[in-house]
């Protein structure tokens, strides 16, 4: 177990990330809030990623720490989970190796989670931020992912049950109380950021900072992509309603196995999501 002597543990899971990794680490080193430690686990890269990590660990001992084990390639999800179960810290942030964090990201996120902990002491809390979507050269595609999609996240966290991915892991900060709710993992756990979202919705609270604080780089090797398309009700899918219901039935069974309640709860949440998205796409950003 790695015990973080600072306030925030930034967990960076990387695989074959030589192209962008140094730029991301440099953006972390440029943060205005300094009370953090970076923990990096390489997932068996075959490029120059291990050498890049080694160089930064030597240049910033105690600030940047390589988490090493003999388990080799775990995959994106389990690489993040391994970091989370290995590091003990008051607060955590997931970090992708191909993004760029704006200088105020850690400070703004930490300030907001502390404000919410004062309002709601002792419970799991997650704070997410907006992000700017860029191409691989950091040319801006969408200044705000949320507004490009017409998706106000505050409308959905009130559901207390999230049948969609609500929080991008790289935008989040969360406290130890939420980390403790993420283990033990079910055998068929979803991706790390979806599991984070689900546990926060189930046991705690989710809050949003309506500022883009990372440059999210879109390129051909992303493990996950930005959801920017504006939601419209899928009228053309009415003919496919039976197959859609079969798919949702399988999804509802999956969430039921994870302990998120009955089928009715899932389908009510889906219906509320559709209604709220129709409202959100017409209003979000107009009053801000």
Segment roles from a protein language model:
Residues 229-288:
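Terminal low-complexity segments of carbohydrate-biosynthetic enzymes
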